[in-house]
From Swiss-Prot:
GO terms for molecular function: large ribosomal subunit rRNA binding; structural constituent of ribosome. Keywords: Methylation, Ribonucleoprotein, Ribosomal protein, RNA-binding, rRNA-binding. Part of the ribosomal stalk of the 50S ribosomal subunit. Interacts with L10 and the large rRNA to form the base of the stalk. L10 forms an elongated spine to which L12 dimers bind in a sequential fashion forming a multimeric L10(L12)X complex. It comes from the Bacteria. This is Large ribosomal subunit protein uL11. One of its GO terms (biological process) is translation. NCBIfam families: L11_bact. One or more lysine residues are methylated. Forms part of the ribosomal stalk which helps the ribosome interact with GTP-bound translation factors. Pfam families: Ribosomal_L11 (PF00298), Ribosomal_L11_N (PF03946). SMART domains: RL11. Belongs to the universal ribosomal protein uL11 family. GO terms for cellular component: cytosolic large ribosomal subunit.
Length: 147
């Protein structure tokens, strides 16, 4: 078995799927760790080609020999909620001004998408987490079942 490489850095970025380029924020973040920026951009764009239009968070692990691995995460719940509600941005005063609404089924669908990144035992609890995020953005959730 090959010896383990020593990790020198962990970089977390949120980049538009299929649209990574050497311009900020990608270039400066990777350049500081000595990573080949174009190599990462090509690999990321190829891996996220099917998710175009979404923002896909990525965790990049940089090793001592300047090689790297990256792990894709699921799109942020806030972005998925904005898309589901059909609005551009959340409310500036979420508990006063309501800017849109989503159904409980839409919350469950988003929870299904994000389940691997959520700290929940089942889809029902995951949907409650998503509903809480929606409320904090000024989006009302219709049809929430009682506990």
């Amino acid at each position: 078995m090959a010896p383990k490489k020593k990790v020198t850095g962990l970089i977390k970025l949120q980049i538009e799927a299929g649209a990574a380029n050497p311009a900020p924020p990608v270039g400066p973040a990777l350049g500081a760790h000595g990573v080949n920026i174009m190599e990462f951009c090509k690999a990321y764009n190829a891996a996220t080609e099917s998710q175009r239009g979404n923002v896909v968070p990525v965790e990049i692990t940089v090793y001592e020999d300047r090689s790297f691995d990256f792990k894709l995460k699921t799109p942020p719940a806030a972005k998925l909620l904005l898309k589901a509600a059909g609005i551009k941005k959340g409310s500036g005063v979420p508990h006063t001004d309501k800017v849109g609404s989503v159904t409980w089924d839409q919350c469950k669908e988003i929870a299904q998408t994000k389940f691997e990144d959520l700290n929940a035992r089942d889809i029902e609890n995951g949907a409650r987490i998503i509903a809480g995020t929606a409320r904090s953005m000024g989006i009302t959730v219709d049809g929430v079942p009682a506990k």
